[in-house]
């Protein structure tokens, strides 16, 4: 049906291209008129375009500057400042709209100028990352289309070899004319430096400056690079610089400009594959729990060995039952227990590939999953712990708890977490207890909950380390360090660590030094970092399969750009084998066959382990080959670039060498072009498409095929029932190959299932981070304001106004003048005197105004005593030091909440709603503490002597964590993923009102507590109270 509608009305892609076509015709029309101009006349065209942009924006910019000058007036009252800020917001929106309009107007002429510049550069010889290069590129029409798409804030899907690097110069050039800076984001330092040097002549011709951000650069160098018109760099470097800027102690320490426009190369790799790993800057913590891992590691090792022995027994029983043709159900139950107890057991994986076994296990599992999985406990109770490989969760059983209690010589109750809510309710109901006794008992419950939760968490992480994480697959051990291997590229990720104690658990398992715990000082997810840009565009060869995620998360539409020449690559149906051994033997046979006829072959693998296995088999056959895993980017690009030569054999991880074209050597076209041989299907269809896309560039011939076995992870965990049933019906024997379009489609359906699951996890992670992101925006905005503003007096008086009202509201009902005067003196060092009669007679507003005026008079006297520059330092120090200290503490508390939040799913509560409530409560508390301590510090600091001034400077130094001890890392987030997995497994049905109610119970709000003007509005809008319901 869909095909019929597409034929009648045209596909979305056809419509997208048709809409852009008139613009392309206009570009080419202008381009044909530029050849008669001299070089200087062409450069004058660019200068003229800059002038047009400035003229279109001049009026709005002047209004904005005037309003910003008004804001600096210390005599402004609070309402006037709020009104100006609202006007500025309106002007900012108008400014962006006018910018978009003028750029759209000049786009055809600008693109034509870039195209003409490329034509004039033809034959230019220059160096690119140490290699001699000759410019031979002039944008084709399809590349112009790609440029228009990028400028529109969309994703341009262009096949490998279509010249995406050149395409990026078109929108980068256009948007750089605004003077606001353009960021071009790549996946590694090598590509950033290569692309900048490669495209530099185009920008240099017109006087536009290009820069590059590299890992090794110092802050001063980075600042200079960010001031360039176009800056290349990796997503990590851009993101970490953003976080470091929000820890800066002075305006001179800032390196980045406000975010305007970013073009993300390999956008799927950056925005999807990296999306589960937040950027984190961390510092050391005084106390670490590494000893606890060392203490319990021997217990867990014995527990795991006991489970392995138990599983081996079940496996033997099952094999005997199957051999003797005994009761199939008993055999299936034994195998199900093996699957739940040790899913990666190699003997089990072999048995699983036998005819009918997978179906038998599935039938038995379905029986126990009936009635909302109420009987699954019968399966797990015989094990020490159960493993769900799909969701990555592990549950300790009663049998496991008893085993650990015997090893630790402690009661098994120490492995049970108390129900805090129920215990508190019992304490509250106990009428014989005094208030002090109740408080003590509650404290004991909270302490017990904390201790046992942490112990269970450490046990769970160690069990994961032993059961789900394999050496030389998920990680490698080098020089006594556990290093993560990227699941997509097979490269080692130095400096990256698993979160939530998992990395320490793996270190304990491997008996290497356990690194101390770190404290998060600043963090942001990739998704929320790229949302900071006013406009975002992206390029890749494979985005269409993830188009829904791009649109839902980033509001990015995907436009598929036609190729310049038709694709000649022939994609063959998958070959399916029963075992990995058969598959590897077939791969080696195919490589020998291809090499004999001189056809180059690129073998794509999903892990380091597989690439090394194939390499050993090739060495045994004395076949010359290259292997790519965990190499430097420069070597990688070099090897991949030569992979198209006659007879070349290259083994590489599926995404190795992205961004580097494989050009065919002499005589290779005649032998069929590059042959792509995938050693297994990846979880994502997109990764497979990327591997196929290495062949058939720019109309070159090529072939691609995937060899799959039933023992591959994808087939084992998510394998289609149809594939298994087909192989069973055909009586598949060892060595047989199945090849049919239906089988290939079934495998793709299994991949789609995994993609949907992974998207749900990434989306859930983002939902968690969105909570923190709203808080981060508020804190960073306050901090940046304090850092850049010349005078903070108005802000401090704003806080004072709120505080005066709150303090008066506290003491007015009981007319407690003594308490009021004592608190004001203690917090602000202000002597406030008021008669009791007057205090009672006045309204809250009148008393608050009197306190406000008294405090202002005190502050102004202080300003007369202290030099102006010292006073400004005091104000800035008061705001920055308090924000930094309190934000660090808040992040630590948020991490603690996130670690255990998934457990609430077992109580039929939505962990996300619970997390939002906890995070909001903590944030309201954070803002109150920041405001009070900032106010207190600003009023109480009196550096009236040189000694006092030295003390302030010393405290400023002490408040900044020493930079050499900070660690910038891209951390593998586990806590929120586990919460998402638990939520997926345990989330109550949306049709269950009781469950919904349990998940959304709000904290009671006291009616007499009026929110402060700067507090978050209780309505949940995310705005300040004064800008929302408090107007």
UniProtKB/Swiss-Prot annotation:
SUPFAM superfamilies listed in its UniProt record: Helical scaffold and wing domains of SecA, P-loop containing nucleoside triphosphate hydrolases, Pre-protein crosslinking domain of SecA
Broad EC category: translocase
Swiss-Prot/TrEMBL GO biological process terms: intracellular protein transmembrane transport; protein import; protein targeting; protein transport by the Sec complex
UniProt KW Nucleotide-binding keyword: yes
Signal peptide as annotated in the record: none
MF term (GO), any: protein-exporting ATPase activity
InterPro entries attached to this UniProt entry: Helicase_ATP-bd (IPR014001), Helicase_C-like (IPR001650), P-loop_NTPase (IPR027417), SEC_C_motif (IPR004027), SecA (IPR000185), SecA_CS (IPR020937), SecA_DEAD (IPR011115), SecA_motor_DEAD (IPR014018)
Cofactor note: May bind 1 zinc ion per subunit.
Entry's localization field: Cell inner membrane; Cytoplasm
Cofactor: Zn(2+)
Pfam family membership, one: P-loop_SecA
Swiss-Prot/TrEMBL catalytic activity: ATP + H2O + cellular proteinSide 1 = ADP + phosphate + cellular proteinSide 2
Region of interest (Disordered), residue spans: 963-1031
Entry GO terms, CC: cell envelope Sec protein transport complex; cytosol; plasma membrane
CDD domains: DEXDc_SecA, SF2_C_secA
EC number of this enzyme: 7.4.2.8
Protein's job: Part of the Sec protein translocase complex. Interacts with the SecYEG preprotein conducting channel. Has a central role in coupling the hydrolysis of ATP to the transfer of proteins into and across the cell membrane, serving as an ATP-driven molecular motor driving the stepwise translocation of polypeptide chains across the membrane.
HAMAP family on file: SecA
Homology family: Belongs to the SecA family.
Name of the protein this chain belongs to: Protein translocase subunit SecA
Species name: Prosthecochloris aestuarii (strain DSM 271 / SK 413)
């Amino acid at each position: 049906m869909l095909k019929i509608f597409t034929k009648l009305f045209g596909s979305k892609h056809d419509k997208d291209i048709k809409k852009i076509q008139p613009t392309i015709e206009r570009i080419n029309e202008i381009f044909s008129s530029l050849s008669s101009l001299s070089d200087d006349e062409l450069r004058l065209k660019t200068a003229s375009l800059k002038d047009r942009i400035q003229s279109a924006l001049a009026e709005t910019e002047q209004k904005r500057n005037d309003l910003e000058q008004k804001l600096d007036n210390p005599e402004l009252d609070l309402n006037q400042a709020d009104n100006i800020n609202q006007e500025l917001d309106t002007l900012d929106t108008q400014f962006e709209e006018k910018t978009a309009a003028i750029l759209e107007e000049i786009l055809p002429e600008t693109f034509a100028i870039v195209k003409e510049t490329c034509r004039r550069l033809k034959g230019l010889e220059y160096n690119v990352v140490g290699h001699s290069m000759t410019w031979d590129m002039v944008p084709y029409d399809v590349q112009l289309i790609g440029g228009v798409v990028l400028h529109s804030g969309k994703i341009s899907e262009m096949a490998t070899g279509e010249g995406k690097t050149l395409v990026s110069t078109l929108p980068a050039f256009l948007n750089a004319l605004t003077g606001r800076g353009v960021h071009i984001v790549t996946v590694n330092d090598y590509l950033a430096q290569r692309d900048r040097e490669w495209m530099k002549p185009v920008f240099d011709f017109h006087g536009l400056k290009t820069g590059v951000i590299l890992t090794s650069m110092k802050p001063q160098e980075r600042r200079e690079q960010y001031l360039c018109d176009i800056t290349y760099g990796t997503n990590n470097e851009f993101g970490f610089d953003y976080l470091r800027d929000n820890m800066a102690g002075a305006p001179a320490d800032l390196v980045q400009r406000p975010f305007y426009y970013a073009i993300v190369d390999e956008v799927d790799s950056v925005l999807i594959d990296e999306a589960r790993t937040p950027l984190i800057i961390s510092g050391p913590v005084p106390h670490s729990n590494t000893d606890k891992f060392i203490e319990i590691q021997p217990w867990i090792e014995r527990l795991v060995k006991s489970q392995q022995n138990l599983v081996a027994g079940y496996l033997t029983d099952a094999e005997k039952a199957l051999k003797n043709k005994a009761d199939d159900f008993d055999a299936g139950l034994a195998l199900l227990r093996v699957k739940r107890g040790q899913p990666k057991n190699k003997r089990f994986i072999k048995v699983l590939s036998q005819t009918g076994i997978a179906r038998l296990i599935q039938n038995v599992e379905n029986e126990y999953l009936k009635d909302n999985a109420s009987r699954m406990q019968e399966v797990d109770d015989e094990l020490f712990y159960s493993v769900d490989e799909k969701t990555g969760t592990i549950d300790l059983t009663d049998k496991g708890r008893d085993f650990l209690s015997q090893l630790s010589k402690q009661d098994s109750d120490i492995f049970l977490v108390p129900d805090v809510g129920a215990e508190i309710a019992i304490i509250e109901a106990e009428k014989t207890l005094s208030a002090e006794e109740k408080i003590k008992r509650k404290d004991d419950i909270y302490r017990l909950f904390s201790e046992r939760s942490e112990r269970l968490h450490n046990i769970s992480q160690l069990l994961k380390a032993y059961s789900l994480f394999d050496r030389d697959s998920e990680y490698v051990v080098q020089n006594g360090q556990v290093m993560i291997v990227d699941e997509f590229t097979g490269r080692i990720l130095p400096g990256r660590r698993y979160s939530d104690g998992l990395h320490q658990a793996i270190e304990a398992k491997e008996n290497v030094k356990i690194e101390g715990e770190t404290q998060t000082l600043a963090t942001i997810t990739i998704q929320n970092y790229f949302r900071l840009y006013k406009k975002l565009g992206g390029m890749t060869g494979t985005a269409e399969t993830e188009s829904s995620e791009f649109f839902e998360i980033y509001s990015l539409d995907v436009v598929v750009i036609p190729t310049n020449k038709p694709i000649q690559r022939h994609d063959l149906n998958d070959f399916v084998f029963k075992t990995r051994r058969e598959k590897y033997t077939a791969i080696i046979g195919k490589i020998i066959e291809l090499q004999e006829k001189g056809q180059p072959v690129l073998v794509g693998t999903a892990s380091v382990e597989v690439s090394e296995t194939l390499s050993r088999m090739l060495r045994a056959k004395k076949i010359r080959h290259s292997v790519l895993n965990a190499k430097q980017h420069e070597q990688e690009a070099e090897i991949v670039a030569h992979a198209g030569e006659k007879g070349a054999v290259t083994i590489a991880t599926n995404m190795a060498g992205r961004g580097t074209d494989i050009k065919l050597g002499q005589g290779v076209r005649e032998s069929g072009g590059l042959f792509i041989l995938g050693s297994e299907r990846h979880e994502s269809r997109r990764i497979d498409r990327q591997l196929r896309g290495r062949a058939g560039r720019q109309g070159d011939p090529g072939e691609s095929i995937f060899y799959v076995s039933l023992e591959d992870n994808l087939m084992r965990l998510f394998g289609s029932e149809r594939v298994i049933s087909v192989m069973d019906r055909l009586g598949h024997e060892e060595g047989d190959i199945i090849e049919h379009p239906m089988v290939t489609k079934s495998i793709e359906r299994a991949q789609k299932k995994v993609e949907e699951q992974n998207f749900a996890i990434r989306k859930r992670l983002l939902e968690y981070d969105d909570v923190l992101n709203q808080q981060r925006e508020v804190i960073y905005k306050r901090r940046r304001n304090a850092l850049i503003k010349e005078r903070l007096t108005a802000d401090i008086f704003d806080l004072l106004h709120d505080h005066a009202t709150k303090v008066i509201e506290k003491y007015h009902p009981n007319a407690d003048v003594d308490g009021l005067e004592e608190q004001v003196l203690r917090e602000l060092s202000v002597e406030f005197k008021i008669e009791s009669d007057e205090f009672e007679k006045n309204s809250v507003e009148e008393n608050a105004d009197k306190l406000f005026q008294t405090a202002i008079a005190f502050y102004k006297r202080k300003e007369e005593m202290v030099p102006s520059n010292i006073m400004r330092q005091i104000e800035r120090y008061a705001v920055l030091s308090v924000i930094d200290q309190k934000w660090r503490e808040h992040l630590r508390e948020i991490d603690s909440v996130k670690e255990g939040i998934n457990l609430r799913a077992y109580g039929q509560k939505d962990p996300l709603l619970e997390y939002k409530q906890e995070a909001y409560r903590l944030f309201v508390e954070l803002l109150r503490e920041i405001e009070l301590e900032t106010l207190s510090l600003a009023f109480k600091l009196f550096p009236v002597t040189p000694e006092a001034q030295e003390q302030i400077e010393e405290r400023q130094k002490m408040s900044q964590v020493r930079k050499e001890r900070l660690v910038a890392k891209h951390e593998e987030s586990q806590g929120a993923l586990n919460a998402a997995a638990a939520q997926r497994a345990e989330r109550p049905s949306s049709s269950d009102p009781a469950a919904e109610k349990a998940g959304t119970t709000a904290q009671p709000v006291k009616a007499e507590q009026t929110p402060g003007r700067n507090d978050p509005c209780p309505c949940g809008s995310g705005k300040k109270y004064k800008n929302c319901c408090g107007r």
